[in-house]
Amino acid sequence: MSKVIGIDLGTTNSAVAVLEGNQPKIITNPEGNRTTPSVVAFKDGEIQVGEVAKRQAITNPDTIVSIKRHMGEANYKVKVGDKEYTPQEISAMILQYIKKFSEDYLGEPVKDAVITVPAYFNDSQRQATKDAGKIAGLNVQRIINEPTASALAYGLDKGDKDEKILVYDLGGGTFDVSILQLGDGVFEVLSTNGDTHLGGDDFDNKIIDWLVAEFKKDNNIDLSKDKMAMQRLKDAAEKAKKDLSGVTQTQISLPFISAGPNGPLHLERTLTRAQFDEMTADLVAKTKIPVENALKDAKLTNADIDKVILNGGSTRTPAVQEAVKQWTGKDPDHSINPDEAVALGAAIQGGVISGDVKDVVLLDVTPLSLGIETMGGVFTKLIDRNTTIPTSKSQVFSTAADSQPAVDIHVLQGERPMAADDKTLGRFELTDIPPAPRGVPQIEVKFDIDKNGIVQVSAKDLGTGKSQNITIKSSSGLSDEEIERMKKEAEENADADEKRKEEVDLKNDVDQLLFQTDKTLKDVDGKVPEEDIKKVKDAQEALKKAQQENNLDDMKQKRDDLSKLVQDMTVKLYENAQKNQQAQGGPASGAATDAGAAQGSDDKKSDDDTINGDYKDVSDDDKK
């Protein structure tokens, strides 16, 4: 089996790792960075991903960030020009970019991947992530929870040590807490909890709101209505947040942020860590409830926890670290990089799948309860949250009315007692139930959850044996045909992007060659035959003409022709120089001098030349 890469598809940044020699290793992106911004931009018909997309976000309104926050949303689309994109398609562009530079690093095609998701992602969000992988041309071998992945990265070399660990995972857009039992190579998730709409972006927004309010107070101008100004504020807020992890105050300086009646306006503010802690205190406090719930579900107390692991870039915030220490009574473990741990753990799971990692068993859980709607709009649970997966559970129900010919199976996920308050995963109907008094027909409803946390539900009339089933699709409703179409479009875009890159490289080559040819012609003037110079000049003009006509095939041919002529002319230049030197009796080159020296020390002329050379060097030194 070929290599299985592990991908942390993050809200603000993504990372990828692969197993090498039984150890996971981060694959750096083309810019040499270990994480890649989860940013996609559309510019002049070209799709840009990562660093380059983030850099031009200020000036390009067609830049998409934090798309992960919308995964699994039924009707969410991003409009660019006259085309609309689903969150799966945008995520697929990020995955496709990661796939490409991973292939460049490994030197072989990459087909298989393990992709991580927040532990508290529901079925729709998980399915949407899997669909994004398919569109990107990846065979998603496994979807695993981010805290579980970081626990794998932490626990791989801990051997048979028996520990209970709490993973506090605060990323760019999501928050999870999981409690795991580690021992003898078994990673068992005991409980998980979280908030899929809480993360570093919210911390940034607190700074942005403060800056907007301060600027409005001073200048009576609302920057929130200026898209370009808001992008600059977002970049400045993110930088300030990072700065305050290491220093107690930071300067925010944004010149020419707006204009007033008297000319340009600048934004200058000092933000202290104490101010930042105060404005984000409610966000930090919001993470406490999931921590308490996870402990409660695992039937543990703080005293039972051996280690606390912090995961996600937002856990670098000192107030977050202090709060976690206060709540758990434990100093967080800093042995793994919070930005990289999830990708490293995903790579380990990839190694388990490919057979490269032995004696590691991962037992994950379903984050939310699953069940169906029953009479009176009640949510009847079949599988409770934090049940180890894969799992299967069935229950027998009956009809609510006499001679009821069909039952509507409304599949739900959540924790609220009433069906209307929970998340609908899907609906299907079991028909042709023989007429009978209410309560007589026996309808068995069975839930199956696979290792990826994806649900299949079936209903069977035990009297007739008739059955119906449904594999829950993402609520964003992508059919297999739509996924295939998007996959094809993604491949075509990749081909078009590659072609565009080749075109740019060719044009750069031509510009460089024309410039170099001009320089070479000046250097060789009077030193090579005129006919050779004429040939080069003619070829140069032919290339310029092809360049003006933008004929790529012709440009390639003319570039190669000119390049060969310039090389031939340069060779002649050196040959002529060598002949002239030999005619004057001097050594033609260092090699000739060595050869002369090898012929014997009684060759007085060679000795004289050597002495003269030394003498000249000394004279030069004296001049200095």
Curated annotation (Swiss-Prot):
Belongs to the heat shock protein 70 family. The keyword Chaperone applies. Residues 601-624 have a biased composition (Basic and acidic residues). Residues 581-600 have a biased composition (Low complexity). This is Chaperone protein DnaK. The modification Phosphothreonine is found at residue 174. It comes from the Bacteria. InterPro entries: ATPase_NBD, Chaperone_DnaK, Heat_shock_70_CS, HSP70_C_sf, HSP70_peptide-bd_sf, Hsp_70_fam. Residues 544-563, 576-624 are annotated as: Disordered. The keyword Phosphoprotein applies. Induction: By stress conditions e.g. heat shock. Keywords: ATP-binding, Chaperone, Nucleotide-binding, Phosphoprotein, Stress response. Acts as a chaperone. It comes from Lacticaseibacillus paracasei (strain ATCC 334 / BCRC 17002 / CCUG 31169 / CIP 107868 / KCTC 3260 / NRRL B-441). GO terms for molecular function: ATP binding; ATP-dependent protein folding chaperone; unfolded protein binding.
